């Protein structure tokens, strides 16, 4: 059995992650694929959950990401192309680099739309209050700008 790839599709909210990840999973050249939403792993938390954007959530977020990584590895070992759909900034790539050192094939793709388009797409669909959502989306959009060595991983999605 061939080991599957792990393809991380990331970017700020409103850049098309879920749409693109779904297409990539369905069009994979592997016999099997899985579309994994990182957000789902945060929704599994029932008691004592801390909103992941708050600074005090760091320990919780590490546990959630570790659980997610283990699931992704297991699918890949099972021969699935693993399409990761979530916010994985360069500031949090070390766990993914560790997978490469474990001989997993990992790809990192950043989707980016203009700030105006990103805000238009993301702000209205959030479950957070508008002010908090605007602040979060603006912050995340800025975090995915000027990616230095990862700029070559960016795909522009403003017109898609």
Residue ranges and their predicted role:
Residues 13:
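The conserved Walker
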Residues 9:
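Hydrophobic anchor at the beta1->P-loop junction of P-loop NTPases
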Residues 1-4:
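Phosphate-binding P-loop
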Residues 124-160:
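Small-molecule kinase domains that catalyze NTP-dependent phosphoryl transfer to phosphate-bearing small molecules
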Residues 59-103:
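Glycine-rich phosphate-binding loop used to anchor ATP phosphates in small-molecule kinases
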Residues 22-67:
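Conserved substrate/cofactor phosphate-moiety recognition/catalytic segment
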Residues 102-122:
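Conserved phosphate-donor/acceptor-positioning beta-strand/loop module used by diverse small-molecule
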